[in-house]
Design a protein with these regions (language model features):
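Charge-dense, helix-prone N-terminal extensions
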Residues: 1-122
Length: 122
């Protein structure tokens, strides 16, 4: 999977926006982080220059199960380990499953929005 394919899939989800929140950072790695969100609630982070993993919002149960099933899934570095996972590309998780979990992260955040926000997005 390429960064273009990954980004295009993320942006194909309804009412999604992207941002480079750390673009003023002096740290080269942080400078290239693309944040994908719905209603300013993050659900995915990925480095567009060093495309080796993505960080996804996840429920604790899903996170625990994925970490047990795949070597490619770890608690997300510098994020709350109960709510975020790192998924490494080109390991034992097929790209199709990674895309499914991007969608799951999107729906996880969407379901946490207040009803009036969800109604605006419908």
């Amino acid at each position: 999977m390429s960064i273009e394919d990954f980004r295009n899939h993320c942006l194909s989800l309804k009412e999604v926006s992207e941002e480079m929140p750390f673009d003023k950072s002096k740290n080269d790695y942080a400078h290239n982080i693309l944040m994908v969100s719905i209603d300013n609630k993050w659900f995915c982070l990925v480095n567009i220059e060093v495309f080796y993993c993505c960080i996804l919002k996840s429920s604790r149960n899903v996170s625990t199960n994925l970490q047990a099933e795949y070597d490619a899934v770890h608690p997300a570095y510098h994020m709350n380990h109960r709510h975020w996972i790192s998924v490494f590309f080109n390991q034992d998780m097929p790209n199709s499953h990674i895309i499914e979990h991007v969608d799951e992260a999107y729906h996880h955040v969407l379901s946490s929005l207040p009803k009036y926000e969800c109604d605006k997005l419908a």
